């Protein structure tokens, strides 16, 4: 008899549970209402870290003058930053989906 398992939530916890259950031979289905990989992770954590990194890079350029380097004004291209964040989010969601699919986990 095959063990069947339904996991509600496709975030990091649900994905880990699904992966382990599949490795142990269970038929696994993940139910996710939003974004596979976790809405909080992909909509909050990733974008905020990308924005922090960009701000840090701008801040670092302000210290260049003290190191004998010519300083140029760095401006944040908000549209470019948003596109970068969206690309990261899409790649992570696709990678998560492909990994789960490769293990026979239904979504």
Language-model-derived ranges and their functions:
Residues 1-13:
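Beta1/beta-strand and adjacent pyrophosphate-binding region of the FAD-binding site
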Residues 2, 19-26, 31-107:
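Glycine-rich flavin
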